[in-house]
Amino acid sequence: MPLAITIALCSALLVLSAVTARAQELFTYKTVVTGLAIPWEIHVDDDGMFWVTERQGLFSRINPKTGEKKVVLDLRDFVELTIENGMLGFVMHPRFPAEPYVYVGYVLKGDTASKRVISRFLFRNDSLVEPQQLVGIDSAGNIHQGSRMVITPDEKLLVTMGDGDWAEKAQDPSSLRGKLLRFNLDGSIPEDNPIPGSPVWSLGHRNQQGLVMLPDGRIFTAEHGTVIEDEVNEIFKGGNYGWPFSEGPCDTPEEKDSCKKYSVIEPVWSTGEATYGLSELDFYDHDLYPVLQNSLLLVSLKQSTLYQLKFDSTRSRIVQTVPILPFATGRLRAIHITKDGRIFLSTSNQDQGKYEPFPRPEDDVIMELVPVPEGATPVYRSIQDTVIMNGMVGELSFGRLPIANDGDAPMTIEYIWIDDRTGNFFNGQWRQPLVVLPKTQMDIMTGFLPKATGSFEDRVNIKVMGIDSPFVYTLIGTAIASSVPDTRVAEVTVYPNPSSGTVTFRTVEPSRIGVTIRDLMGRLIWTGSANDATSLTWDGLTFDAGSCAPGSYHAVV
């Protein structure tokens, strides 16, 4: 495989104005806990202790002042860890610790198939003990597990249940997949549920990763779309939210017919022709940060951004969407707002969706959102002026261009582009604009996909908010032919290409076929193999069964 390297040649500093700093971001992040592995849910108790589930199967209490971590529940030998599975969400009894119950969601290993479980534990002697299973779904699958929980003021337990990749079950009222469920706290079924004897409160959901109840009792969820239309929904008793025959607003002829037929409730907000990977959400109406009041605060995995969704005065419409610190820390999974209005978030940079330059050595982390100090400024520093990449013809390689913010305010990179004078380089940093936090270094990714042997030169440009001219850096790429001629390439046919669905790779004679699919940033999309076969078919999905966005992909056979 080609080796991607960078060489440090020079360093330069540029101080941005204080006015520019305040125009970019009002907030920054302060890291409070490090060294976690995919923290899925976080909660801060009245003593300032962090309660954290990690997908590997650990549930811990962490002292943020000392860093001491006390494991209260260890299910690492029992949870299924494939793709999105593991230990997931939790919620504490509203009168905890007087009522010492904690409700935990996880996926258990099984002899033949995994099982999605919600259990109630008793907190005693610094441990969670005496589990009582409230929900169990056999054949849980590997994705779309939901498992966010809220306890309402009338002491009912709400639980999101994704469709488990069984889309057709989301409309089946006899199935728990693709639903929002409602239980009494002992696991029994409330008498006022919409379907007698059933925990189903609403249906037609794909994968609800966020769940919150507002002070007025209204319920909102955040839900993943396929390749479009992540949604924020207001939940009503017995409501149908359309999956799998509608996503986002009912705006196509087919969706309009289905939505009318099934009385579908449309989302209050959606992401349109893209997905953000929406995760947890919470409601902010505290005095600590007035600019965030009357808003849903929503974290995203794919877009790696905290979003403020501001309500109108009646809280019936979202009237403003404000991205906060985009792509500054990688993927964001959990958010928790304390009683006094402090805001904590956790990263998810060790999961299957990780991307360069994450994870960093300290990942995963819990951070607090804090105001930028008055008069603070970002300070741009160039670390090197050239990126050197080596590769083979037709194969992807990547380089890293490190830049730094030596100031005490966040710095916004507005956009990055390649001059593309040779057609051999591409922008590996599609996530933009992005923010570089104070006292932080960020690697800007560049790509090299040579079409022929030789040495090539191009330029990458970085435009920083508050500076008129972009910073310009040199890209140098050297391409060589494959050291071992591969005559098999001519014997492989690929069809259909382009494709709107499955793609088949066919050989002339039976052989072992191996195919790796990557996007143009080099991220693994899918890999498969077959022995003594003449064909191998890719279903157009990612390795974790998600849909691929339209675009170009690189296949190695």
Model-derived features: positions:
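Bacterial Sec-dependent N-terminal signal peptides
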Residues: 1-25
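Acidic, Gly/Ser/Thr-rich repeat motifs that build Ca2+-stabilized beta-propeller blades
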Residues: 24-167, 213, 217-225, 274-314, ...
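Terminal connector regions
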Residues: 452-479
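Short, solvent-exposed loop/turn segments enriched in Ser/Thr/Gly
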Residues: 393-401, 442, 449-460
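Residue-level detector of functionally pivotal "anchor" positions at catalytic/ligand-binding pockets or at interdomain
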Residues: 374-385, 476-495
